[in-house]
A protein has these predicted regions:
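N-terminal loops that bind phosphate or other acidic moieties
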Residues: 1-177
């Protein structure tokens, strides 16, 4: 089996495990908020995870933040497993770029920078747009019912794309991606 690229191995090696030593203080803070314990469900889990990632710092620093909406077509759509036809991917990307999707409302409300990444949409390139990042790994994935959806190289390219996007966001001053 071929090995991972040195760059990907270096990125993986640089990932520090989260420190659970701050969990009691983080959980105590969540439990002392004016709300029933655990009533925020998954949001409380996310807050505790951010608390760990930031080494127990309070308040949590998530501003400025950026969300990457990464778009691509899936070959398995040919099997009729999707609620919508493949063409909807392109329509949704245009909707994101024109500010007409739910993610746009959430980002605008929270003051979060939204970027749309074409990592594998079928068809022609999208017209330039300030929120669009064109980084196609492939023109869609293959149909996983007939074989692997991605090659090993495509998978690695997709992982490195995510790392590149996170690094650029950090360089731009984002504290949360």
């Amino acid at each position: 089996m071929p090995s991972l690229s040195p760059r990907l191995l270096d990125l993986i090696a640089a990932i520090d495990p989260v420190d659970h030593g701050h969990d009691p203080a983080g959980q105590a803070h969540l439990d002392n908020l004016t709300k029933p314990r655990g009533s925020l469900g998954r949001l409380e889990d996310l807050a505790l995870q951010l608390h760990r990632i930031q080494g127990g710092a309070r308040p949590l620093a998530a501003d400025p933040a950026r969300i990457f909406t990464i778009a691509g077509d899936h070959g398995v759509a040919a099997e009729g497993v999707s609620l919508f036809p493949q063409e909807v991917t392109r329509q949704m990307v245009l909707n994101f770029l024109n500010g007409g999707a739910g993610i746009n409302v959430l980002c605008a409300t929270a003051g979060i920078d939204l970027r749309v990444v074409d990592a594998g949409c079928l068809g022609d390139d999208f017209d330039p747009h300030p929120q669009l990042i064109r980084r196609k790994v492939a023109p869609g994935t293959a149909n996983m019912t007939h074989g692997p959806a991605m090659t090993r190289e495509q998978c690695e390219a997709a992982l490195l794309l995510g790392a590149d996007l996170a690094a650029q966001a950090a360089a731009d001053g984002c504290r949360c991606v």
